[in-house]
């Protein structure tokens, strides 16, 4: 990302804290359920739809920082200005970022992800981000999992009452005092699958998680 002007730095700083405060205020009013889960000892690839980004830091806070014993994970985030705001917000939850995407900086992001995994860090990907189409799966998650022989896990949340933004990703923001179900799926292994078959398997895994979590 290019060097930021003073005006942009101020904008990002204000947006960063407003979003951080907003999601915490919503989260604290909600009834939240985290489905009991576990991850393998070795690193893995975790995927969730871009439209579930708003409240996903709380899944990291609960599982990676608490239940998994301060296990490390980093999220692949685009170099776009929206990605800069996201990077700043999630940093307050102790979440690191690997900058780049399938549209810009993709090769750099992939190499960064491989390096992090070899250092024992899980890599989290929004397969339809940063620009869509909605619920599409880019090549990165499949390539990463197959190259390093890693399992893939679907991370998801659904809310009993929510706002759905008119954005390409149909961002879901739970309403205050709603119920939120978080889940982390069983492992998916893509060994032997073609690129297209692997991408479709990830899609179906995420859809299955959404269907299950929507039962309140």
PLM regions and their residue ranges:
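Non-catalytic C-terminal accessory region of glycerolipid acyltransferases
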Residues: 1-21, 25, 42, 88, ...
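Alpha-helix initiation/capping motif
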Residues: 5, 36, 76-80, 138-140
């Amino acid at each position: 990302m290019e060097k930021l002007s003073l005006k942009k730095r101020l904008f990002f700083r204000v947006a960063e804290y407003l979003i951080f405060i907003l999601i915490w205020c919503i989260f604290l009013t909600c009834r939240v359920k985290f489905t009991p889960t576990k991850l393998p000892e070795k690193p893995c690839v975790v995927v969730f739809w871009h439209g579930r980004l708003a409240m996903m830091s709380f899944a990291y806070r609960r599982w990676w920082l608490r239940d998994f014993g301060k296990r490390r994970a980093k999220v692949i985030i685009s170099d776009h200005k929206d990605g800069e705001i996201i990077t700043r917000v999630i940093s307050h939850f102790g979440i690191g970022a690997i900058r780049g995407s399938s549209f810009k900086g993709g090769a750099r992001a992939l190499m960064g992800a491989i390096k992090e995994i070899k250092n024992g860090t899980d890599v989290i990907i929004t397969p339809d981000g940063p620009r869509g189409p909605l619920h599409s799966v880019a090549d990165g998650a499949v390539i990463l999992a197959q190259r390093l022989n890693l399992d893939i896990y679907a991370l998801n949340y659904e809310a009993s009452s929510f706002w759905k933004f008119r954005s390409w990703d149909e961002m879901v923001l739970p309403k205050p005092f709603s119920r939120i179900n978080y889940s982390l799926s069983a492992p998916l292994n893509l060994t032997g699958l073609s690129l297209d078959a692997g991408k479709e398997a990830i899609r179906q895994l995420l859809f299955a998680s959404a269907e299950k979590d929507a039962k309140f």
